[in-house]
């Protein structure tokens, strides 16, 4: 499957696969192989697993406006195969459901992707001994959790972009009127009404994608009312406690942590507090922190020409 010439993914060939199924709803992963691989002899390519952002509520695996230019550029420079899964979203799902999907994806990746590459005669074969796990916003939590839940898969490095890695942060959990990405959400009473109405109407359904433009008001309401974390924890599950998981595993692959200091969606404090825990629990972890002036998703239009991004990519290349 080809992308339009003006797409950020125009240098890749796309193939979609069902990695799991929930109540007759397919969970899809897109595999993007470098187009130039078709012009060369068969070879092994490193794998970049990408978990999309959207506050666990909106977005989708190939929602282009939220894909960082530099990340696509870096993947191409490494001749990498990108694998981007969808997953169930809040509030129809819970955090436990989402991490069930994470588990199902990793099992599928290791059991099925090599044989799919073989049967489809891909010129680029996935090298599952070289995995880079990347996630934006909510997806950044899933990238870190992937390494903690599956240390046996030997993820070589992680990139966490403005992720809610630590939940006990007032700006994330305490309801209060506030401007988010330059916009004031509806007043608290109206916001609560919108949330309740949506949850009532969507009860029992499964959703794995949501246009941010169509669902933006709902997301703003959930953020303002501090509901994201409570919805994630609606079904108790030990996998949702990142610091506790980190204490159990005791280690983490090399981590490049990127976060805007002016983030009004996921407070920078979420990354700061996680780093404090990491330095106590696993002080030998190789970490690069890029705390930059900027809002949520501040890096999407940036390229590898930026010194700090080039330095971060060099950091990844030493481990991946």
UniProtKB/Swiss-Prot annotation:
It is an enzyme of class 3 (hydrolase). Pathway: Secondary metabolite biosynthesis. InterPro entries: AB_hydrolase_3, AB_hydrolase_fold, Carboxylest/Gibb_receptor. The gene is M8. It catalyses: a carboxylic ester + H2O = an alcohol + a carboxylate + H(+). Belongs to the 'GDXG' lipolytic enzyme family. This is Probable carboxylesterase M8. A motif (Involved in the stabilization of the negatively charged intermediate by the formation of the oxyanion hole) lies at residues 52-54. GO terms for molecular function: carboxylesterase activity. It holds the Pfam family Abhydrolase_3. Probable carboxylesterase; part of the gene cluster that mediates the biosynthesis of squalestatin S1 (SQS1, also known as zaragozic acid A), a heavily oxidized fungal polyketide that offers potent cholesterol lowering activity by targeting squalene synthase (SS). SQS1 is composed of a 2,8-dioxobicyclic[3.2.1]octane-3,4,5-tricarboxyclic acid core that is connected to two lipophilic polyketide arms. The active site is at residues 137, 296. Keywords: Hydrolase. Its EC number is 3.1.1.1.
């Amino acid at each position: 499957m080809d992308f339009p010439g003006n797409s950020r993914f125009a240098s890749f060939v796309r193939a979609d696969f069902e990695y799991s199924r929930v109540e007759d709803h397919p969970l899809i992963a897109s595999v993007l192989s470098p187009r130039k691989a078709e012009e060369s002899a068969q070879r092994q390519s490193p794998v970049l697993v990408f978990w999309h952002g959207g506050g666990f509520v909106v977005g989708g695996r190939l929602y282009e406006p939220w894909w960082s230019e530099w990340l696509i550029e870096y993947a191409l420079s490494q001749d990498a195969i990108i694998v981007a899964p969808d997953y169930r979203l809040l509030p129809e799902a819970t955090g436990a459901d989402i991490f069930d999907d994470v588990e199902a994806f990793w099992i599928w990746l290791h059991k099925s992707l090599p044989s799919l590459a073989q049967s489809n005669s891909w010129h680029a074969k996935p090298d599952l001994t070289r995995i880079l796990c990347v996630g934006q916003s909510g997806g950044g939590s899933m990238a870190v959790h992937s390494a903690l839940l599956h240390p046996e898969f030997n993820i070589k490095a992680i990139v966490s972009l403005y992720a809610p890695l630590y939940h006990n942060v007032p700006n994330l959990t305490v309801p209060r009127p506030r401007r988010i990405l330059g916009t004031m959400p509806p007043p608290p009473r109206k916001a609560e009404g919108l949330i309740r109405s949506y949850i009532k109407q969507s009860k029992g359904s499964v959703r794995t994608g949501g246009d941010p433009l169509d669902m933006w008001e709902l997301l703003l309401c959930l953020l303002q009312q501090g509901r994201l974390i409570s919805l994630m924890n609606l079904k108790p599950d030990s996998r949702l406690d990142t610091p506790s998981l980190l204490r159990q595993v005791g280690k983490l692959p090399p981590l490049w942590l990127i976060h805007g200091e002016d983030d009004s969606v996921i407070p920078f404090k979420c990354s700061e507090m996680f780093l404090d825990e990491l330095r106590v629990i696993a002080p030998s972890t190789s970490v690069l922190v890029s705390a930059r002036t900027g809002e949520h998703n501040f890096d999407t239009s940036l390229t590898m020409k930026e010194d700090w991004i080039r330095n971060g990519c060099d950091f990844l290349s030493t481990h991946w």
